[in-house]
Amino acid sequence: MIKYLPRLIVILLLASFTLYGSLKSFYNNKIKIEAFTYEVKPNTSILDLYDGIYESNNLFEKSLFLLGIYLFDFRTIQAGEYLIDDNLFKVLTKMKLGETITYKFVISDGTNKFDLSLYIDSLKLNNDCEDFSCIDLVNDSIEGLLLPDTYFFKSNTNLSLLLNKSSSELKSYVDMIWRDKPIDNPLKSKYEGIILASIIEKESSSIDEKMKIGGVFLNRLKIKMRLQADPTIIYGLMPDFNGDITKQDLRDKNNLYNTYVIESLPPTPISMPTRSSLDAAITNSPNEYLFFVADGKGKHIFSKTYNEHLEYVNLYQKK
């Protein structure tokens, strides 16, 4: 027996080096294919996983695959969608820990129901909220009930979870800032505040200008002057708006959102207002201005009188 010991030691050493080389290959081997996503179904076995991902690509021998699985304790994997873009060891580590792909759900500043519906259709969400039925709509309008932000989700998450989270955050924010509404602010309800904020949102993206524009609209509401805001007309014409507001559009009494005709705020918000627009509507006071006009450079020029306003219109919009 002793005379065979040197041979046995050599065999064991060779086996050890072979095993080490195999495990090193398992650990370091890069996937030589274009990255793709793969969904691990509940109760998927290791062999099913091998058949589904690796056998078809001839990346690993099954023996090496199984050896690595058991030695590195990858026998339990979690269901979900994974990105297959790295070496086998890292991929299986993600599956063991349940590090599934995370997607973004972005409610854009000032978006509306038309654009939001198209966007939702493009996402890997379970749409259990057709026509926004999971939200308590006001006058069948989702505008003003969701807070623009980025929300994260996993594949096949219920849409209702994201929308209700956004709606809850919007409500909490409005409840908080409503306590800071100045006495001279003429808004009668939180919903009126959201409506006005949605108009401010479409008038400017500048946080500094939003407060000034909000002050103009609050001043008009205070003296019962029509808002005359073009974005409200546009919303009332959607989804068929062709890009131009005509004189006929300005006089259209059938457009419920035509603030050149109606005496006060439109019946619902026209967009999803951001926090800064909500601040500009609710925590703001009427200012000394009644008019503003775009200067063609992304800003606005404000005026106190109609004659002054006409001068600015001729200067900036009739060049």
Predicted segments, located by residue:
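Conserved catalytic or metal-liganding residues and their short signature motifs at active sites
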Residues: 1-238, 269-276, 280-288, 295-319
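Short acidic (Asp/Glu) and glycine-rich catalytic loops that position anionic groups and cofactors
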Residues: 193-194, 255-259, 291-292
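Conserved SxxK-family serine transpeptidase/carboxypeptidase catalytic domain
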Residues: 228-270
